[in-house]
Amino acid sequence: MSVAPLKNDVFLRALLREPVPYTPIWLMRQAGRYLPEYNATRARAGSFMGLAQNPDYACEVTLQPLARYPLDAAILFSDILTVPHAMGLGLDFAPGEGPRFAHPVRDESDVAKLAVPDMDSLRYVFDAVRTIRRELDGRVPLIGFAGSPWTIACYMVEGRGSDDYRLIKSMLYGRPDLLHRILEINAEATRHYLNAQIDAGAQAVMLFDSWGGVLADGLFQQFSLAYTRRVVEGLTREREGRRVPVIVFSKGGGQWLEEIAACGCDAVGLDWTVNLGTARRRVADAVALQGNLDPMTLFGGAQAVRAEARRTLDAFGPVGKGGHVFNLGHGISQYSPPEVVSELVDEVHTYSRALHAG
């Protein structure tokens, strides 16, 4: 595929801790239900899966936030559960209930049926990546992503989201051998999946370990981080003549920051409970940091959003040899006022320039 040269590579350079003129910003779930235009496209598609599995629709919603805001990266519109869906678990999004699987993985016979899916079954994702790259025309980089092996295992075993993770933790403590087998398959599948996204044109990739923080110390390292590391170690790290940065985000994982930073990634995503300055000292600028405004700040109005953006940037401090990508500490709420996002992006771009001077 012939690709246009990047007009704005500030996001990629910040991830690699290279000098940039300002702090780049993008938002987790930036293409989502808080945007009226997203809801209109989803209505045309008929369902979430109808949206995600149609490369043209996926491209359309990926680009929608960039039409509103001068964001520094686009992120592929998809879902972390496409991989287990390709394994035959039957993903469905029930209205008002979120994702659920028709065939959850609960016992030895279920685990025996699991296998790394043929990547051709996920071709719609890679077609979407190619379509988005073409339509971006070098405007900003495109981020690909996947769920971490542990996080997608949570959904596979529970069958849906969970408040207490009773089923997967029952397996963890009672049949750890079964859980390790699931995680091995997930890690291999995720490695292939992300590499296929990179081959299709993703210029950075992110692993969402959304549920890593529900694990006890020691078990996080064994059941989450070890398999995240397997994925990271197997990724294509150079494409189109430049490095493909890898971001790892473990929500609730602040206590393990140093260990996450040592997994081979280029950047660590932080939730809003971690002080950026403290985190920076802990990793000693060995990796870039991404985050970490509380998503609920967006409900405080423009003045509060601008003040909290400045406070977050000040916490990281003068950039120097570090790297900072501004983001929320988790995905943007569907109820967020779109006009306040404009205030956030403007404040980050304007205020951060002084932190990059000299």
UniProtKB/Swiss-Prot annotation:
What Enzyme Commission number does this protein have?
4.1.1.37
Looking up Gene3D superfamilies in the UniProt record yields: 3.20.20.210
* Residues that, per the record, bind substrate: 29-33, 48, 79, 155, 210, 330
CDD domains noted in UniProt:
URO-D (cd00717)
Catalysed reaction(s) here are: uroporphyrinogen III + 4 H(+) = coproporphyrinogen III + 4 CO2
- Subcellular location field: Cytoplasm
Species of origin reads Bordetella parapertussis (strain 12822 / ATCC BAA-587 / NCTC 13253)
Gene this chain is encoded by: hemE
Under the cellular component aspect of Gene Ontology, which terms does the record hold?
A: cytosol
HAMAP family of this UniProt entry? Answer: URO_D
- Give the function comment from the record: Catalyzes the decarboxylation of four acetate groups of uroporphyrinogen-III to yield coproporphyrinogen-III.
* Family (UniProt): Belongs to the uroporphyrinogen decarboxylase family.
Annotated site residues (Transition state stabilizer) in this chain? 79
| Pathway annotation from the record | Porphyrin-containing compound metabolism; protoporphyrin-IX biosynthesis; coproporphyrinogen-III from 5-aminolevulinate: step 4/4
Protein known as = Uroporphyrinogen decarboxylase
Q: Pfam families this protein is in?
A: URO-D
The organism's taxonomic lineage, starting at the top = Bacteria, Pseudomonadati, Pseudomonadota, Betaproteobacteria, Burkholderiales
Q: What GO MF terms are annotated?
A: uroporphyrinogen decarboxylase activity
One Gene Ontology BP term is: protoporphyrinogen IX biosynthetic process from glutamate
EC class of this enzyme?
lyase
Q: How does it assemble?
A: Homodimer.
Entry keyword set: Cytoplasm, Decarboxylase, Lyase, Porphyrin biosynthesis
